[in-house]
UniProtKB/Swiss-Prot annotation:
Zn(2+) binds at residues 280, 283. GO terms for biological process: tail-anchored membrane protein insertion into ER membrane. It comes from Debaryomyces hansenii (strain ATCC 36239 / CBS 767 / BCRC 21394 / JCM 1990 / NBRC 0083 / IGC 2968). Its EC number is 3.6.-.-. The gene is GET3. Belongs to the arsA ATPase family. It is found in: Cytoplasm; Endoplasmic reticulum; Golgi apparatus. This is ATPase GET3.
Length: 348
């Protein structure tokens, strides 16, 4: 039976139980614009709920997309009071982490402390680990808010992630299982090297390992939530070119191996030059190429929501421009009826 899904993200925007939405893909395909557009539509559709958009990409673009400065703490978007944004700063997070670790040992000459500092600074994927810690923090906050009335804290209905390019994102999503293995090795070390560690670290190592056990429980809960399609989904973003299509397929296969829900693909920068009296020969030639790969995507991902977004005449910056552009996530772009919007955005 041929079941063609709607070419929109309406099922995600209207979904009532989603807690986590990841937006990812190859570099330069419009992930930030797409994640910002999804966040804007969620905020517009549910004005009584609070939403948070987090950038985990070391090269942050959220501030540029909204024309508003964001930092490591959540800040409300001007013009959308129920949407907040934050950009995770790995250096600041690492500094906070080292300060927290120093409470267990104040001796600056301690060789164990020096060794741990060197290790954390050189571990591959430390940026992804720090981003994951931010996820753990929000999990913990949700638990507190669900357990008690705290009028000063904000409970976010859904958290949207503007992720780094594919490789970083896949490492980020591997962290739950990786951390469980790492924590298991730390447990083994505590048993074998316990007496020596106590001599070197002033007897505070037991507190550290107890803290790691608590982290392990939270990691397991995150893993459960990330693999629950009622709570988490992943939106793939690409452009209609061979390399982007190839990387999208690779990413989808990886996500499926992690048991993550992925059934939506946003294709950006489409020219829709067919039958356009204003298109040039170069546009027509490029649209012909785009259409070839669009047809391939239609066959390959017939059971996915395949959303086709137009290439506009200027940059999509600011809340008002994002509102105009993001409506095509819910209503398919019509080249004839909607062509005016291509040049109708406010320049920032």
């Amino acid at each position: 039976m041929d079941l063609e899904l709607e070419p929109t993200l309406e099922s995600i925007v209207q979904h009532d139980s989603l807690k986590w939405i990841f937006v990812g893909g190859k570099g330069g395909v419009g992930k930030t614009t797409t994640s910002s557009s999804v966040a804007v539509q969620l905020a517009l559709a549910q004005p009584n709920e609070q939403f948070l958009l987090i950038s985990t990409d070391p090269a942050h673009n959220l501030s540029d997309a909204f024309c508003q400065k964001f930092g490591k703490d959540a800040r409300k978007v001007e013009g959308l009071p129920n949407l907040s944004c934050m950009e995770i700063d790995p250096e600041a997070a690492m500094s906070d982490l080292q300060q927290q670790a120093s409470q267990y040992n104040n001796d600056p000459n301690d060789p164990l402390k020096s060794m741990m500092s060197d290790m954390t600074g050189s571990i591959p994927g430390i940026d992804e680990a720090l981003s994951f810690m931010e996820v753990l923090k929000h999990i913990k906050n949700q638990k507190v808010l669900e357990g008690e009335d705290n009028s000063n804290a904000i409970s976010y209905k859904t958290i949207i992630f503007d992720t780094a390019p594919t490789g970083h994102t896949l490492r980020f999503l591997q962290l739950p299982s990786t951390l469980e293995k790492l924590l298991s090795k730390f447990k083994d070390l505590s048993g074998k090297l316990g007496p020596m560690l106590s001599m070197m670290g002033g007897g505070q190592q037991q507190d550290i390992f107890e803290k790691l056990n608590e982290v392990q429980k939270n990691v397991s809960e995150v893993n459960e939530q990330f693999t629950n399609p009622e709570l988490t989904t992943f939106i793939c973003v690409c452009i209609s070119e061979f390399l982007s299509l190839y990387e999208t397929e690779r990413m989808i296969q990886e996500l499926m191996s992690y048991n993550m829900d992925v059934n939506s693909i946003v294709v950006n920068q489409l020219l829709f030059a067919e039958g356009d009296d204003h298109s040039c020969k170069r546009c027509e030639s490029r649209w012909k190429m785009q259409k070839k790969y669009l047809d391939q995507m239609g066959e390959l991902y017939e059971d996915y929501h395949l959303v086709k977004m137009p290439l506009l005449g200027c940059e999509i910056r600011g809340v008002e421009n994002l509102k105009k552009f993001s409506k095509f996530l819910l209503k398919p772009y019509d080249p004839k009826a909607d062509s005016d919007i291509v040049f109708d955005l406010e320049e920032k």
